[in-house]
Amino acid sequence: MGSLVAETNGSEIKSNKTINHYMKKTIATALITLTSITMTAKDSTKHLLYKDPKAPIEQRVEDLLSRMTIEEKVGQMNQLVGIEHFRENSQSMTAEELATNTANAFYPGMTVKDIEKMTSDGLVSSFLHVLTLEEANQLQKLAMKSRLQIPLLIGIDAIHGNAKCQNNTVYPTNIGLASSFDVPMAYTIARQTAAEMRAMNMHWTFNPNVEVARDGRWGRCGETFGEDPYLVTLMGEATTRGYQGNLNTTQDVLACVKHFVGGSYSVNGTNGAPCDVSERTLREVFFPSFEASVKAGGATVMMSHNELNGIPCHTNQWLMEDVLRKEWGFKGFIVSDWMDIEHCVDQHFTAANNKEAFLQSILAGMDMHMHGPEWQKAVVELVKEGKITEERINESVRRILYTKFQLGLFEHPYVTAKERDRVINNPEHKATALEAARNSIVLLKNDNALLPLDATKYKKVLVTGINADDQNIMGDWSEVQPDDKVTTVLKGLRQISPETEFEFVDQGWDPRNMSQAKVDEAVAKAKEADLNIVCCGEYMMRFRWNDRTSGEDTDRDNLDLVGLQNQLIERINETGKPTILIIISGRPLSVNYAAEHVPAIINAWEPGQYGGQAIAEIVYGKVNPSAKLAMTMPRSAGQISTWYNHKASAFFHPVVCGKSTPLYPFGYGLSYTTYKYSDLRLSANNIGKDESVKATVTITNTGNRDGVEIAQMYIRDCVSSVARPVKELKGFERVALKAGESRDITFDITPDRLAFYDIHMQKTVEPGEFEVMVGGSSEDAQLLKTKLEVK
């Protein structure tokens, strides 16, 4: 062709040179315009209101919400397991488990690539079972690829320290912490745990477990604060405050108040079984700890596995909306437990399929789903079908986004390895773990003052038992830690008494598969020793999930020692050599033979990474034991209802062929010194129903050692419109006393400590006579008593 012809609105024909010049100018202008648009888009993204850290959180939430698609909104209600957990379990499971098992988080039909894509598409809000900083950062990088760059919440079961992660501090479990009656310590441990979690780029702990544990068969007693509503309430509230701080720094994490409600009081003592309980018992026993933690600012609440009076907790509108939000003013978000919404289909049979179960749960008040592959698609469909309004979805998403802004995750989605290494397992935290362990160990028996040991007298000591030299001492919700980070009982003994010859006979770690030959060997060695230490109890380590005898989903039909442990104790004790039994367990055990025949018994619960040192310090008198039982120790499973705060008629008819009294009562614990309570008096003997009074008692350390006594105040309403407990804990204090020292201790008796739900289910203080009791345990014989008249 000789020329190019262009015609524009009748204009003249231009030459090739003119046209080429025109095209170059046009392309250049277009490129400048495109660059300008791109820069403007980047600039506008950078200056979006929701990304402005100076803007009020409420405005940031609304701005972000307005930009989200329905798919992205539902994604904010979606939690999945971490990629490494997913990959590891998928590879290790059998074909049958892959097809049927939900507990190990295998998602049939999904791959790691699918999870990564969902995350980078903004369809995942949170992950759990992420155990390393590297994976947490990698998941956040995926989230930052999403359109709106909404950061993830990383959740973990940091029940007693962030113990599922390597090199993090492992404190005593909650049942031991409760036995210290040390509320400030609970707060401190939670603060330190929060710091270690944030150093691992984790933001949400599934704790405190504020269920009141009344049944020792239930495997999760160890993660609770015991059987008393008042003690559980104070420990749970302090723990909640400790985790959260002000929820505005990189030292704060979200608490998760769980499990709401009734899981600790199932009909057969098994996890997830039905709970059938009156509203009166709910409000008097099980609700107070939840209410206090919620009103302390608890940011999240987890529902309980079970059905409550026929209605699954995960679809229970009365619990989620009426009680939590309307009565208690809960502003945070509610999360399901491990695929428990789906269990409405295959366990409770209250929904025909998962989609229907999701509908029921969301309409009842659920905000976030833990965990499972079907949630995203099904919930989006429910909205598009008009069965759930978008505004209902917005309610949940607002609550979830609010916490992410509070925690500063939009500004700080990553954490460096340098910051992690500076914080985790630091000297201050390790010192706290050791001190907490010392204060959590209960001395149950000490005939003829066998303890503390005189190292010059007992030069050759046999140490044996499944818990003598095993990391199981850390307790449930722990993963294996480097050996140099954990002090077992054997290590602790050798550390504290290096001049003693300790001979160790290993019984293995598994109580169900103990060797008769090893028991025989230990008995033979016991005959040659000056003294014997037997470390028994239960096995709790989660990496051997199917081998545990205590912990989550590890419930029992009896409370006896498992396997050959009783034989080991009996035969060693029968050698005639002084014998000490050390129990390491997450639940109260029925050690009847030992209680009658073994001269010294220590109940160490699950004392954490320095438990062995703390036990050894008590054995050799470096530390004077002070802990008191946070849970009654029954004689058998038939005595599970012998909690101290029973109703008066509970034992009107005594049992035959046995005893009505427990092995050791709530609040019980010995010391190497003795204490005397005297002169219990009230600041007024008569008060009005809206008035307060003070109860004062004198406590004297009558022994020759310094010590700490846990003074306890109980109250009974003598005559009331409804049947009331024989006593209820309403005050306690840790009292440090030098040998020979006396101190006056004062307890406040306020109207709320006298109030109860009357015959009309109204909380009130009824006029009449109250009995005030103060002493060193809940046992009547240990209590001083006086009367208070309320007009």
Give the label of every model feature segment.
Residues 1-46:
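Bacterial Sec-dependent N-terminal signal peptides
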Residues 17, 39-755, 766-780, 789:
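Glycoside hydrolase catalytic-domain context in secreted enzymes
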Residues 785-787:
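Extended hydrophobic alpha-helices typical of membrane-associated regions
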